[in-house]
A protein has these predicted regions:
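Proprotein-processing/basic-patch segments
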Residues: 250-259
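Charged linear interaction tracts used for macromolecular binding and regulation
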Residues: 91-239
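Short acidic/polar inter-strand loop motif in beta-rich domains
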Residues: 237-249
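Long, polar/Ser/Thr-enriched low-complexity segments
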Residues: 1-122
Length: 259
């Protein structure tokens, strides 16, 4: 591996591993980058003004994180990076938008949203996917998770868990477009980011659960064609101690439908 010349920080001091000649060349280049306007020539429009670059993917990812704000504790450290890949791919697929001002049409790429993974290290939830049944009303404001004799195999139950419960989550993500007036990316619908979550009753491990877990948005919520609803389910294990339920790590959450 070659030695890269440069300046590095050691404690509260800055040191260099370059020779005096290398440092002189480095200083000249650094001064040119900082002070010489001709060193970097940004793209300019017809009027000669620099063309601004806007990142619609980053704004869209922030919108997705707002949707999952009640589920972030069940995600891993690379969750945001995976969201960025999805948003960037959707951003690139906009063939109608202007360069650097393309839109992020989630409503046209719902299949990508269905691939969201909250925690790649927790895979037991995928094994239980066939035990879930879900339905939603036509206006997409309410969904029901149906559990018939839902039972978890002992090999999937973490050590120390005495009870479990099911979570049912809905969230709304709107398309993001560039606003010429505000000079930034904004959601098409103000409902973007709205979410609702409902839990089932605590059930002792080893006991089959039969229940309908219904979750809905506030009354009067009307969704538009620019909105997409992400439906997620999860299993949360707890340990009962002194009459209180203590959550154990490793809660599994997965996206089951996008409509």
């Amino acid at each position: 591996m070659t030695k890269q010349p440069g300046i590095f920080r050691s404690g509260n001091k800055y040191k260099t591993n370059m020779t005096s000649l290398e440092f002189l060349e480095y200083s000249k280049t650094h001064e040119r980058v900082v002070h010489d306007a001709s060193y970097y020539k940004p793209k300019r429009d017809e009027n000669g003004d620099p063309v601004k670059h806007y990142n619609g993917s980053a704004t869209a990812v922030k919108g997705l994180r707002v949707c999952f704000q009640t589920l972030l504790e069940h995600t891993d450290s690379r969750f945001t990076g995976r969201l960025m890949k999805i948003a960037t791919e959707i951003y690139r697929r906009d063939s109608e938008g202007e360069h650097c001002k393309k839109s992020v049409y989630f409503s046209r790429s719902k299949g990508f949203l269905g691939t969201i993974q909250f925690n790649v290290r927790v895979i037991f939830i995928d094994i239980l996917a066939h035990l879930f049944e879900w339905i939603h009303v036509e206006d997409r404001s309410e969904a029901t998770l149906v559990l018939n004799d839902f039972n978890i195999k002992p090999c999937l139950i973490p050590r120390g868990a005495t009870h479990y419960r099911i979570l049912h989550h809905l969230s709304i993500i709107s398309d993001f477009v560039f606003s010429e007036y505000h000079q930034c990316y904004m959601p098409v619908d103000k409902l973007s980011g709205m979410n609702a979550i409902v839990y089932s009753e605590y059930t002792p491990v080893g006991i089959a659960l039969t229940e309908a877990v219904k979750v809905s948005f506030p009354s009067g919520t009307v969704l538009s064609e620019d909105d997409s609803v992400i439906e997620s389910v999860g299993v949360e294990f707890t340990m009962k101690s002194a009459g209180k339920f203590l959550e154990l790590g490793g809660c599994g959450v997965m996206v089951v439908d996008v409509y």
